[in-house]
Swiss-Prot record:
Top-level lineage group: Eukaryota
Biased composition (Basic and acidic residues): 182-195, 270-292, 359-452, 623-634
Chain segments annotated as coiled-coil in the UniProt record: none
Biased composition (Basic residues): 196-206, 228-269, 314-358
Protein name: Uncharacterized protein DDB_G0287625
Biased composition (Acidic residues): 75-88
Polar residues composition-biased segments: 554-576, 605-622
Residue spans of biased composition, Low complexity class: 89-133, 149-158, 170-181, 207-227, 491-553, 635-820, 867-891
Region feature (Disordered): 65-133, 149-463, 491-580, 592-834, 861-891
Organism: Dictyostelium discoideum (Social amoeba)
Length: 981
């Protein structure tokens, strides 16, 4: 899984995160800041994800896998039906049902995650995702994927932004295009009505006064339908009027009386018109005002005449105002429509601002000059008064008609006429609504109090569930955490299985084993106790380790993680000898034991501490108690079980089952490799094949689209398991009572005999004393056969089901064969591989070989783990983590809790922080003195806090701005990232 966190310079663009998803997911709600890891997902609604911590993220990846997804469904429920998991884990359904029985939905999800990760690690992401590809694209209404489904958020946004930009743009433009579009029809109707009305009035009045040409031109101009036409005409008439005015200006006083009277008549008309135009807001002037103006303007006649052509008035302000006023007043043919239109469009921007130029000196000069030359000054005043009154009536009629017809003027009701108040209210409401919508869309941050979660562009919370093994969508709700660290954000799994069920989440992985366990309910009941526990143990061992490595980290992540650009899940999963598998095995051990320790003490402590986050996670106190007990048992088993410590089983079959990618099943796949060639198939299709595990040994290969088995010769129980899986299936069928399929028995051997596999576990576990251990499953050639079938030493690992009782022996065999490590050989064999690969790491060039040593010991040594330097490196001191249950003295176990989005989903999005729920990140005490700052170190997906900023972390692709690259040859097998200052 790769994150390319690149900050973009712009404020609006989010940081892009390139993600590959390798885990199946049950229910997914994408909150802002959530990301789908294994899908090529683009999450482009920048308003929505603009705050993760404090940074913008856009989740962007390429299109390659999107076609394989059926899709995400919108759902308001945080917990979707298990049927969905069963649906997309159809291969996994049988065993997932068992997982559902044994473990919670998280188990299903984890089974899905495990099986699907396993699927993902091989071909099955493509296969199983292709089964599910349509729904994601379908649900992409809310989430836009890069490829085919990039419609959703972007489209909703685009729709919104288009409509918004329409409304905003119309508000901004000085042109009246928008309002003309909106009111064209109504205005035409209004004009038709007001045309006849005003025409009759104007004729009756103006004909009597001898201005028939004026009223005719006015009524003619009123019939102009669109403002754009009147605007273009006003341009023409403006030029004509300016020419005519300049001509009239240039005429000397000695011109004939006729020419002066002509220009005077034009000017007098323009004077009254411009004055009424300036009063188009409905402010009529009294007669005394007009007299005052006329007196005031006659005084300046000679001066204004002399200055009119002068260049003192050539400044843009006066020129523009003069031209504007002339264009209204001069050409009488269209002056009315033009004055009305222009004044309205200007009034939009405040109306009053253009009033003074409208009554500028030019008009006053013209009026004064005309009055002085006019013989009948009173007649002119009366004419102007009548025109003003007529214009006011027209304004009132127009406004009344517009309001009656629903015309919405964009000037926010600045009229004083009748209906102005109503229109003002309507405009105010419309504008408020527009602003509300705009603000709502802008404020879709998860931190916005309004939204409290991911909102679609329509303001609805997006809740999506992937109905397919699209893998690790780090969903905060019902997704099972592979490893608490791997799926750090998948704390919802913790909800179901409780944080201890992070082991149970790992158990959900081992719920695949639990499927085996359920299948081997005899074995798996022991193992479901131990498999819920030993699934916690083995899940921690198998699932957390194997899931982390085999499922997500082991194979899928290695395939998807940046450094292994060449490695595809098929390549990695099939290459049993690849160092990645060994690495994955070792890391699986580390992760298993971290999960053990976390779930063991930290969950109890955190739950006992009354942590609300844990309470929100835990579906119920019963689940908490059960999970607590399971995890205690599991942790005890896991501590006692070298399987937890046996990367041999895990890693042996991680080698085998890394191919199976059911490292979860790998431990069980040790036995599950016995059967997880069958049960890896079963674990691949442990969900399926656990029911069919006998068949799944063969059918797992067949049933697993993963065909990890097919890819794994081990995973190909068809190869070995088909041979012995036939035996296994036979033996499974022989042992099917314990394991519904003795491959389940193997899984039971792996699971119950996870207790038997936990013969590392079960060597120490009384489960080894379980009849499961005593079961013919253990004794079954199935267990022995898959042991024989899977690897010779994986057979021994499978025999480690039986021989995992001698897992040290078989694991030695497996260590010899699988490069997995027994407790005896942990210090020797397990470290050499990683030591060869990555001798030094980090700023201090520390030998990280102790990592594998210490983590291999973690399962057995309960209190020594805190003193291990791993705890110092792997734990983080950054403030976003809350350490609970211990001091940093190096001796007390410390849970570093990370806040994730889980309780947002649990609360239905009522909390506005994305990462509200704490999650077990690391159970270690920090020795911060060793580092300047250990920013954050995780196993697998999750958030990394850098500079108090939460950023997604699966496996970092380091660039100049990010932490130093991991010196190990291939960084991909481990999700553990050391981030130094």
């Amino acid at each position: 899984m790769e994150f390319h966190l690149q900050k973009k310079a712009t404020k609006t663009n989010a940081t892009t995160i390139s993600i590959e998803i390798t885990k199946p997911v049950k229910n997914i709600k994408l909150e802002p800041g959530q990301f789908i890891e294994d899908i090529k997902l683009i999450y482009t609604h920048t308003n929505t994800i603009r705050k993760i911590g404090t940074t913008n993220y856009t989740i962007v990846t390429d299109n390659s896998n999107i076609d394989n997804f059926k899709g995400i469904e919108n759902s308001s429920d945080d917990d979707d039906d298990d049927d969905d998991d069963d649906d997309y884990n159809n291969n996994n359904n049988n065993n997932n049902n068992n997982n559902n029985n044994n473990n919670n939905n998280n188990n299903n999800n984890n089974n899905n995650i495990n099986s699907n990760k396993n699927i993902n690690s091989n071909n099955s992401i493509n296969n199983s995702l292709s089964n599910n590809s349509s729904n994601i694209n379908n649900s992409s209404n809310n989430i836009s994927y890069i490829g085919n489904s990039s419609n959703s958020i972007n489209n909703n946004d685009n729709k919104l932004s288009r409509s918004r930009s329409r409304s905003r743009g119309s508000a901004k433009t000085t042109s009246s295009l928008t309002s003309s579009k909106r009111s064209l029809d109504s205005r035409n109707r209004n004009r038709d009505r007001s045309y006849t009305r005003s025409r009759s009035r104007s004729r009756s009045r103006s004909y009597s006064r001898g201005f028939s040409s004026l009223s005719r031109s006015r009524s003619r101009s009123r019939s102009i339908s669109s403002r754009s036409r009147s605007r273009s005409r006003s341009r023409r008439s403006r030029s004509r009027s300016s020419r005519s005015r300049s001509r009239s200006r240039s005429k000397s006083k000695s011109k004939s009386r006729r020419s002066r009277s002509r220009s005077r008549s034009r000017r007098s008309r323009s004077r009254s018109d411009s004055r009424s135009r300036s009063d188009s807001r409905g402010r009529s002037r009294s007669r005394s005002d007009s007299r005052k103006n006329s007196k005031r303007q006659t005084k300046s006649r000679s001066r204004s005449e002399s200055r009119l052509p002068d260049k003192n008035y050539s400044s843009k302000r006066h020129q523009n105002s003069r031209k504007r006023n002339r264009s209204y007043s001069r050409s009488r043919t269209r002056s009315w429509s033009r004055s009305r239109t222009r004044s309205r469009s200007r009034r939009r921007y405040g109306g009053r601002t253009f009033r003074s130029p409208r009554r500028s000196r030019d008009d006053s000069r013209d009026r004064g000059r005309d009055r002085e030359r006019d013989r009948d000054r009173n007649r002119c005043r009366d004419r102007d008064r009548d025109r003003e009154r007529e214009r006011e009536r027209r304004l009132r009629d127009r406004n009344r008609d517009r309001e009656r017809d629903g015309y919405r003027e964009r000037d926010r009701g600045r009229y004083r006429e009748r209906g102005g108040e109503r229109e003002r209210n309507r405009n105010r409401d419309r504008d408020r609504e527009r602003d509300r919508n705009r603000d709502r869309d802008r404020s879709q941050s998860p931190h916005n109090e309004k939204n409290k979660g991911f909102l679609s562009s329509s303001g609805n919370k997006i809740e999506t569930k992937l109905k397919s093994p699209i893998s690790n969508i780090t969903k905060y709700s019902d997704m099972d955490i592979d490893n608490n660290i791997n799926n750090i954000i998948n704390s919802n799994n913790i909800n179901n299985n409780n944080i201890k069920n992070s082991n149970n989440i790992n158990n959900s992985n081992n719920n695949n084993n639990n499927n085996n366990n359920n299948n081997n309910n005899n074995n798996n009941n022991n193992n479901n106790n131990n498999n819920n526990n030993n699934n916690n143990n083995n899940n921690n061992n198998n699932n957390s380790h194997n899931n982390t490595n085999g499922n997500v980290n082991g194979v899928s992540k290695t395939t998807s993680s940046p450094a292994s650009d060449n490695s595809t899940p098929e390549n990695i999963s099939t290459d049993l000898d690849s160092p990645l598998l060994k690495k994955n095995q070792q890391l699986n051990l580390i992760k298993e034991q971290t999960n053990k320790l976390k779930t063991e003490d930290s969950i109890d402590e955190s739950n006992n501490n009354g942590n609300d986050r844990f309470k929100t996670k835990c579906s119920s106190t019963e689940n908490e108690n059960k999970n607590r007990e399971n995890e205690k048992n599991n942790s005890e088993n896991s501590k006692n079980n070298p399987n937890n410590n046996n990367p041999n089983n895990n890693n042996n079959n991680n080698n085998n089952n890394n191919n199976n990618n059911n490292n979860n099943n790998n431990n069980n796949n040790n036995n599950n490799n016995n059967n997880n060639n069958n049960n890896n198939n079963n674990n691949n299709n442990n969900n399926n094949n656990n029911n069919n595990n006998n068949n799944n040994n063969n059918s797992n290969n067949n049933n697993n689209p993963n065909n990890y088995n097919n890819n794994n010769p081990n995973n190909n129980p068809n190869n070995n398991n088909n041979n012995n899986n036939k035996n296994i299936n036979k033996n499974n069928s022989n042992n099917s009572n314990n394991s519904n399929n003795s491959s389940n028995s193997r899984n039971n051997s792996n699971n119950s005999n996870n207790n038997n596999n936990n013969n590392n576990l079960n060597n120490n576990n009384p489960n080894n004393n379980n009849p499961n251990n005593n079961n013919p499953n253990n004794n079954n050639p199935n267990n022995n056969n898959p042991n024989n079938n899977n690897n010779n030493n994986n057979n021994n690992n499978n025999n480690n089901n039986n021989n995992n009782n001698n897992n040290n022996n078989n694991n030695k065999n497996n260590n010899n064969n699988n490069n997995s490590f027994s407790e005896e050989e942990e210090e020797e064999g397990s470290l050499n591989q990683v030591r060869n690969i990555s001798p030094k790491i980090g700023k201090y060039n520390e030998d990280i070989s102790f990592l594998e040593k210490e983590w291999n010991r973690l399962g057995n040594v309960q209190n020594d783990t805190n003193s291990s330097p791993i705890s110092q490196q792997l734990s983080t001191s950054s403030s976003p983590f809350k350490s609970t249950g211990g001091s940093n003295d190096g001796n007390s176990s410390d849970i570093i809790m990370m806040e994730s989005n889980n309780d947002i989903i649990n609360d239905g999005g009522k909390k506005n922080r994305v990462f509200k729920e704490s999650q077990v990140v690391q159970r270690e005490s920090l020795d911060v003195s060793k580092f300047k700052k250990s920013k954050a170190i995780f196993f697998g997906e999750g958030w990394i806090y850098r500079n108090h900023r939460k950023e997604p972390c699966v496996s970092w692709r380091f660039n100049n701005n990010t932490p130093p690259p991991d010196p190990r040859l291939n960084r991909d097998y481990i999700n553990l990232r050391y981030v130094y200052e």
